[in-house]
């Protein structure tokens, strides 16, 4: 009973913070921008958050994080609009929605598909917020018991999950992560004062900025990939129709929404591609449970309801490892670490104990944000359709300009703009050779944290690496990491893993 009353008390504290006029305004702005970048193919939340990081300098930490979080889950909502109306997923997580969502639109049921996607996302978002609130206290209490060796082992496990869930071969994913960790060591060593991998270049003596790598790998590289492929935009020209599903539609969609919410909530916790796999896993489950699986791919409402719910639930539960353990499970959460660092906040269990207003304010803002997204998305569908008719070749110059302004304004450094372009070419080359860029950013952000924890553990143990084996928790986590990689390399698992990603594509 006391745990429940604590939860209610904490959520009421969060609502009192999130419902201030300023924070409601920032939440609305984040959700609106997020929906916009979700609707426009090729402008993801990663590039957008990177672009807006400098603006957060002038905001208070709570408002800044509420806005950035709104952009992330708003983009998941917006991606479904493009998937249904144009057959192009605005977000990687909306790929599965194109299969049945666009078929429904072609049958004159675009409104119902959009309505059920929005309602499913709203329900999943609300449930995921309750899950975050419920798991926050026990996970934070557990995290406070972790020593440096345990934290190091937990981050190794996180990176191994990212390896297993990354597209492409396991060795490629490990290679990309190692490059990310190597890049995290660039700059001056804070312990010895020695410069590492700077090659005498003073501009990088403070280390590489996470914004430079993120904007290059996910902003510029994405633009290059989009220019290369000529997308045929199969825009639905007919009337969208009634946005409110009828009773029969709601009855058909109810169970898939509940199952999708559960699947997405669990997979969203996993580092790497967990949130992306949620919608695909939901679609597979719905197809297996269906009385007539042949309906899928021809406009089955369950094929929209389940994946869209999983998509939004996963986007929100991804905040759990970040807020409780200080470990980002995906590239967007890695940028949230950057945003927190700007404001002098150390991600992890201390947020909840030392800054409860920020922690609970951010969680409560997700409820408000989900309600806003329902209000923003349905009435503005006409506007999004008009936007989608603008050819990409006319949009990309302004996107490039905004990316350059965003990077320049982080440190007022022209050199960083050039470096971003370099990382853009590097990211484009990686994609060409079948490497996935997201693990690199994860390796870069976790690399710094891992080095810090490794050093702390060795100082405590007086230089003995046995500390990682002596402690049962760190030993268990390292063994689990090893098992994960070995299992992923096994031929039978490797084939089914490749099959999953092939179908997801």
Describe the function of each predicted region:
Residues 1-64, 140, 195-300, 385, ...:
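Helix-loop-helix hairpins and the membrane-proximal interhelical loops
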Residues 2-3, 115-228, 342-494:
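Membrane-embedded alpha-helical modules
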Residues 31-45, 74-87, 162-167, 261-271, ...:
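Transmembrane alpha-helix interface/packing and boundary motifs in multi-pass membrane proteins
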Residues 45-54, 68, 83-103, 134, ...:
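Re-entrant/interfacial helical elements at transmembrane boundaries that shape
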Residues 62-66, 103-120, 291-303, 331-334, ...:
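Membrane-interface alpha-helices at helix entry/exit sites of multi-pass transporters
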Residues 72-84, 90, 300-325, 329, ...:
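A structural-propensity feature for long, helix-poor, extended segments
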Residues 73-78, 119-131, 139, 183, ...:
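Membrane-embedded alpha-helical segments of transport systems
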């Amino acid at each position: 009973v006391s745990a429940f009353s604590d939860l209610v008390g904490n959520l009421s504290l969060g609502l009192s913070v999130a419902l201030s006029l300023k924070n409601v305004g920032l939440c609305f702005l984040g959700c609106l921008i997020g929906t916009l970048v979700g609707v426009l193919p090729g402008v993801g939340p990663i590039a957008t958050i990177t672009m807006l990081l400098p603006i957060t300098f002038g905001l208070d930490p709570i408002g800044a994080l509420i806005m950035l979080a709104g952009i992330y889950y708003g983009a998941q909502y917006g991606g479904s609009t493009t998937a249904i109306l144009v057959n192009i997923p605005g977000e990687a997580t909306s790929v599965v929605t194109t299969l049945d969502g666009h078929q429904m639109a072609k049958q004159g049921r675009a409104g119902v598909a959009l309505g059920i996607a929005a309602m499913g996302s709203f329900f999943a978002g609300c449930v995921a917020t309750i899950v975050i609130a419920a798991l926050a206290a026990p996970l934070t209490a557990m995290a406070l018991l972790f020593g440096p060796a345990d934290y190091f082992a937990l981050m190794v496990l996180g990176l191994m999950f990212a390896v297993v869930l990354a597209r492409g071969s396991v060795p490629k994913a490990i290679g990309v992560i190692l490059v990310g960790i190597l890049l995290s060591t660039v700059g001056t060593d804070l312990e010895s004062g020695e410069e590492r991998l700077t090659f005498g270049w003073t501009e990088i003596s403070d280390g590489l900025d996470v914004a430079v790598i993120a904007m290059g790998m996910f902003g510029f590289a994405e633009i290059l990939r989009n220019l290369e492929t000529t997308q045929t935009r199969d825009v639905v020209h007919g009337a969208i129709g009634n946005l409110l599903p009828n009773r029969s539609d709601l009855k058909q969609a109810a169970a898939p929404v509940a199952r999708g919410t559960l699947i997405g909530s669990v997979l969203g916790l996993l580092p790497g591609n967990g949130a992306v796999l949620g919608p695909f896993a939901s679609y597979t489950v719905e197809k297996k449970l269906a009385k007539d699986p042949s309906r899928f791919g021809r406009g089955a409402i369950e094929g929209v309801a389940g994946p869209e719910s999983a998509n939004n639930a996963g986007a929100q539960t991804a905040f759990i490892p970040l807020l409780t353990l200080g470990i980002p499970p995906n590239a967007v959460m890695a940028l949230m670490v950057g945003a927190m660092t700007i404001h002098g906040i150390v991600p992890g269990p201390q947020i909840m104990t030392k800054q409860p207003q920020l922690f609970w304010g951010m969680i409560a803002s997700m409820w408000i944000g989900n309600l806003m997204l329902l209000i923003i998305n349905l009435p503005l569908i006409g506007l999004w359709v008009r936007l989608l008719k603008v050819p990409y070749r006319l949009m990309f110059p302004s996107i490039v300009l905004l990316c350059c302004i965003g990077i320049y304004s982080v440190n007022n450094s022209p050199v960083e703009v050039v470096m971003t372009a370099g990382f853009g070419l590097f990211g484009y080359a990686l994609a060409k050779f079948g490497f996935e860029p997201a693990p690199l950013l994860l390796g870069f952000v976790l690399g710094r944290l891992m080095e810090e924890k490794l050093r702390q553990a060795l100082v405590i143990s007086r230089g003995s690496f046995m500390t990682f084996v002596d402690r049962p928790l760190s030993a268990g986590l390292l063994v689990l990491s090893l098992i994960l990689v070995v299992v992923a390399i096994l031929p039978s698992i490797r084939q089914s893993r490749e099959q999953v990603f092939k179908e997801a594509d």
